[in-house]
């Protein structure tokens, strides 16, 4: 007997657990109705009358998809046998149900009649069940159809009636009698009737021998030993030895690989090319060869240079053809062409041809093949200079078809930068004499300060450079004297204000001026001596008053010596060398 409780997702309580019953003492006391006493659907009907059909409120109609684990009424996917036995039910409800009448018969429908109405409604919508009668062919067990003895063969004619409605009874399939094979009748027949045929002992022994041979010849599969759950946890020594075996197997594999590398990789180490890691484009541009090819070429070149002479075509003159020897320690460059590299290539590759033309000017009928440059065998292909040519915009232009002085690309001297667009030439700048004249006339309307300079500009142009330099020096001398005298006068005025009584009113201004003058590096000890001399000359402070008043009232009049220096300053630009060039870092508006 195997108990197989299977859950079904149903709301009518007609599943496989509906007929599961526990025998009770109270039920055993009433032996008049054994089926009704063992069937407790009346308790369920009473419970359904009290509470609505909801998964939260009912334990019996709980859906298996319920996730409300906090509610005590929900089964939450687990089996709940509450209110099925009489142990957990209310005795008041039980007594009330027991007093109700029980309808016994084949009719499963109970009709509920409302007060004062003759209309009868069925108490349930469950279909009418036709009980299946088991055929009794076998006197002992019978002959079931599907190999299992089902409890549905036993008809149940009891239905519980309450005041509201009735839930129909279902078949009890919780307990099933299951045999090992599907065909139960054949097994029962084999058990009931023993075999009458006796087999030969010799045939049995031969079959046993053949089966033993067959089992020894075939490869046996790895059998999985069924262990208990305690051993399957792999705890303790079993887990330790399993890990140890995996670790040892991994270390053995690593040791095997290392041993294979050690034994069978000596060839790669022996024929290693070089330890230098250079990129592929550098190797290509520098004429890279493998070690084997390099050694073969070196040996062949050595034997070739010792034994035989190079083969020359018949039409080529060997005497006049120069032999270009390439040194082995040439710094190899990249193959990218720049304008300077093109110029160098054009000048270097044709140097031998220029010597030929200078030596033999009379030999006019020589072919162009004589102008080829011969070279000794070398390790790198880039050193083997063939016909002199240059590459301009991915086109090879041979230089041998032109004369030495008539190349298709004109060679320019790199030192000559007269036509360079990035150099500003000061000679091309135009003087702004008209604008200067308008500015000076607007500034000095009644005063003719620059008349001498403007009038004498034409006469100064005809002077020599030595006279111009002398005039420039005089102009700078007079300018510096005027500036220094003005600064000395300022120092004297500051000293006068410091000595006066109104010292506090001008204190901040005078301190700022004094700090600026003291921090200035222009005034040296000579300035201090001149200041002392001038202080000794000025006896009374009234002279400073007259000096300051005159300087405030009258405009600044340039002395005659300063006017003469301005005339020399007008031609100061012409005294500087005319070929001075300026960088782009200087502002454009400033002319030197």
Swiss-Prot record:
Q: Where is this region: Disordered?
A: 186-223, 528-553
Biased-composition ranges, Polar residues, are 193-204, 528-537
- Localization per record: Bud neck
> Main localisation, per the record?
other
This protein's GO cellular component annotations are:
cellular bud neck
**Residues annotated as transmembrane:** none
Give me the stretches of Low complexity compositional bias.
213-222
Name the domain of life: Eukaryota
Family the entry assigns: Belongs to the AIM44 family.
What protein name does the entry list? Altered inheritance of mitochondria protein 44
- State the species of origin: Kluyveromyces lactis (strain ATCC 8585 / CBS 2359 / DSM 70799 / NBRC 1267 / NRRL Y-1140 / WM37)
